[in-house]
Swiss-Prot record:
Recorded GO MF terms: ATP binding; glutamine synthetase activity; metal ion binding
Protein name (Swiss-Prot/TrEMBL): Glutamine synthetase
Domain GS catalytic: 107-473
InterPro entries: Gln_synt_N (IPR008147), Gln_synt_N_sf (IPR036651), Gln_synth/guanido_kin_cat_dom (IPR014746), Gln_synth_cat_dom (IPR008146), Gln_synth_gly_rich_site (IPR027303), Gln_synth_I (IPR004809), Gln_synth_N_conserv_site (IPR027302)
Cofactor(s) demanded: Mg(2+)
Role description: Involved in nitrogen metabolism via ammonium assimilation. Catalyzes the ATP-dependent biosynthesis of glutamine from glutamate and ammonia.
Protein keywords: ATP-binding, Cytoplasm, Ligase, Magnesium, Metal-binding, Nucleotide-binding, Phosphoprotein
UniProt: Mg(2+) 1 binding residues: E132, H272, E361
Catalytic activity line of the entry: L-glutamate + NH4(+) + ATP = L-glutamine + ADP + phosphate + H(+)
Amino acid sequence: MTQTATDVLRLIQEENIQIIDLKFVDLPGIWQHCSFYQDQLDEASFVDGVPFDGSSIRGWKAINESDMAMVPDPTTAWIDPFCKEKTLSLICSIKEPRTGEWYSRDPRSIAQKAVDYLAASGIGDTAYFGPEAEFFVFDDVRFDQTENKGFYYVDSVEGRWNSGRKEPGGNLAHKPGYKQGYFPVPPTDTLQDMRTEMLLTMAKCGVPIEKHHHEVATGGQNELGFRFATLLKAADYLMTYKYVIKNVARKYGRTVTFMPKPLFNDNGSGMHTHQSLWKEGQPLFWGDRYANLSQLALHYIGGILKHAPALLAFSNPSTNSYKRLVPGFEAPVNLAYSQGNRSASVRIPLSGPNPKAKRLEFRCPDATANPYLAFAAMLCAGIDGIKNAIDPGDPLDVDIYDLTPEELSKIPSTPASLEAALEALQQDHDFLTAGGVFTTDFIENWIEYKLDAEVNPLRLRPHPYEFALYYDC
């Protein structure tokens, strides 16, 4: 594991690495990259950065002020297993070359500011995050949208809808039923070997691996697990996780999506996010209150629940996100907390008498989120809850899905759409700008980008199901 620029440069020489691939994340959360011959990187590159044109990166600079610099983090080095020539990957943050300051719209720099804000607050010195991102593996995906047509088509050999089709060599059955895909062994689980390769490849890329398994939905839903890490490192790991999973699937002739709801009438894919605070090596969430939580932890939960509608603009930032957040598909739609209750939006996992394992799990997020922004926003909400002693109310230790409409009406719910979440963010973002983590400019730019690039274009287009509903009017 490299720690310094000197370590990286030594590794390049010792391993005879020819190509250096610098990766950074754009505003929506997609990795971008540029590859350099090995002699283009030196000690100064890790301080001043490597220049590039930022005008074509979504949500960033205008063309008349486009000079940017990628600053590689030497602790993120790994040899890319998908490149033909030996290639060293480094994850970068972005600097403004003219000022030498970190770029205020760079998601990774924002995540670092959140970490610094926690330390400056005196509350704690370490925030641990553990995301669990689910995904689908499909065999065939087609979609198109033009003036006279709009459709999507996805298929999977595991799809229950294929139980009656003719297949080469015969239909061998063993296709998971709807909501029956959790933990079956092969031959029902056709993806065992692929997931194993994904997991072991992640380890080669420096991600601390734990497990893999099939998930609930039919049609190839899966999850791999990696160990929790500090906020910035957890976001780096998640980006690597997605990169590895997509590329291993491509080797197998398959394709992966982290879309929250690619299939109608079955469970969607979430990104449950575990989190805890520590100070001087001691866990801060363990205590003598409800579920062995500390008062500080309850206030952290209070901050998450209070700001959840605005938080979802970052943790669930797609129009598709809100097709997952509906009742009946194991997705939390009500803003409550509970011990062990997976129908609550904040769950306190049963961790036994181990103080170091005490944590909370925010169950709303999905993997369309930019992890740097989502984790930073969650931490800011938690800090605000602690600073202002926000009471989370009483826990809800019943199955929320079994409550009557009258009982449910008393529980706050998640926004019903991305537009509603963006409106909540517009009204509630002081907790994000506290400590200089997010800037007002960034928040305004995020809202504008999401409306212009996603919400409004979707509003303009007829939906295929509208033809089923209204064509014969």
